[in-house]
Amino acid sequence: MNFMELLLFVLSMLLAVAFLTVAERKTLGYMQRRVGPNAVGYYGVLMAMADAAKLLLKEMILPTHADKFMLIMSPMMTLMSALLCWAMIPFGPGITIMDSNYGFMLALAMGSVGVFGSLFAGWAGNSKYSTIGSMRSTAQLISYELVLTTVILICMLLTGTMNTSRYVELQESMWLVVPLLPLSLMWFMGCVAECARPPFDNVEAESELVSGHMTEYSSSMFVLFFLSEYASMLFYSTLTAILFFGGGTGLILGLKANFFAFTYIWVRAATPRVRYDKLIAMCWIVFLPLLFALALFMPSLIYIMDGYTFME
């Protein structure tokens, strides 16, 4: 993939994120029995452009006692982390920016760097709301990264590969969600928590922390955090489609990823926020023990399924 193709991919990703926000607002509107955006452009589709113009034209205010260098670098670090994850995604046979034998682990490793962005943003803002939000963010993201990593390791035990392209090929006969349905549900909940999306949006709980680690941000710096959140949501939706639903090429993969992205929105509209201590306890007391037990059971499952599924 040359530089122009890479640049086109990044711009396409940012454009997809922009229109995902419009889709979210329209979906929430219909679920709450109202219209949603409908004035800017045909059916409100240009609302994303209007929002972007509004945010970028605002003044960027840096607090007097803040660490200005870290305050500016943190959102850039978070967005870069969210975009680098896409290097491991197979969009078709041979269409991968970086085809590695450790693709899944590298994707999660790149995504985990975003934790530092939110941590540094909370510290640099010199605000109690930012600090509490960054501490919540760090604890929540690190906890649920363990859940996602354990789920991927269990899937790798069953398929015998960490290469994302090879992984898609092995699901041609049967999607992995069939034998591992409980695991896929834990994976999805872990993805929602990892993206800090409702009902697990304790990182920026408006009623408690104003806007969490983003409290002191405005204008273009806030846009970078906003883009990174939705880019991560699209990435984990695509990874879910690959990990449990056979992936696909081009349009098929896009349709599957869009379905899971809309599932995030439906969950947001239908569920109240989970209390923070309950969220962390669910990870350490419920999910991780269950996943470790399933990892111990996996050799028996491989023996039972040997001969007519993924094992070759």
Curated annotation (Swiss-Prot):
GO terms for cellular component: mitochondrial inner membrane. Its main location: mitochondrion. It is an enzyme of class 7 (translocase). Belongs to the complex I subunit 1 family. It is a multi-pass membrane protein. GO terms for biological process: aerobic respiration. The chain crosses the membrane at residues 3-23, 37-57, 69-89, 104-124, 141-161, 173-193, 233-253, 279-299. Core subunit of the mitochondrial membrane respiratory chain NADH dehydrogenase (Complex I) that is believed to belong to the minimal assembly required for catalysis. Complex I functions in the transfer of electrons from NADH to the respiratory chain. The immediate electron acceptor for the enzyme is believed to be ubiquinone. It comes from the Eukaryota. This is NADH-ubiquinone oxidoreductase chain 1. Its EC number is 7.1.1.2. Keywords: Electron transport, Membrane, Mitochondrion, Mitochondrion inner membrane, NAD, Respiratory chain, Translocase, Transmembrane, Transmembrane helix, Transport, Ubiquinone. GO terms for molecular function: NADH dehydrogenase (ubiquinone) activity. It is found in: Mitochondrion inner membrane. InterPro entries: NADH_UbQ_OxRdtase_su1/FPO, NADH_UbQ_OxRdtase_su1_CS. Pfam families: NADHdh. The keyword Electron transport applies. It catalyses: a ubiquinone + NADH + 5 H(+)(in) = a ubiquinol + NAD(+) + 4 H(+)(out).
